[in-house]
Amino acid sequence: LVWYAARKAGKKGSDTAAFRKVIQHYLPEQTDLLCAQYQLSLLKRSENWKDYLPKALAFADKFCQEDWQRLNDIAATLSEQYTTKDTHEKALKMALRSVDLHSVYDNYDTAAQLYFQLNDLTNAKVFAEKAIAAGKAAGTTTTATESLLQKIISAK
């Protein structure tokens, strides 16, 4: 819907004012959430990691404490795009909250990755094993997590 409206107006999908207008019209009760998420998606798409981090942290705090999917998505992005211990600790907090809300392969895998990046090999192993078990139970490919588990075991 938004993409269609932007295309009709000759925009390329980065007009935040046009996005807000469409959202206010069709989903007024979700305007703040969806506009903030849209801004994050623009930063992610343009790989503007300097501006992404503070906005992602604020977005997670304000909108995502009960949303396991968004929390895990942000935590995974922070894990992949940042190298600082402080950022990984914040991402781990999100990943663990996501696991608390809904324990599935992706959430366990993100937590395992973050524990590994933080050099907490004991918890990394626990969460990698949980990820593999959850993935296999759901019929999900777990090859990446199995590879991580081998790295964890080798690093111990």
What residue ranges belong to the model's regions?
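Oxidative protein folding and maturation machinery
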Residues: 1-156
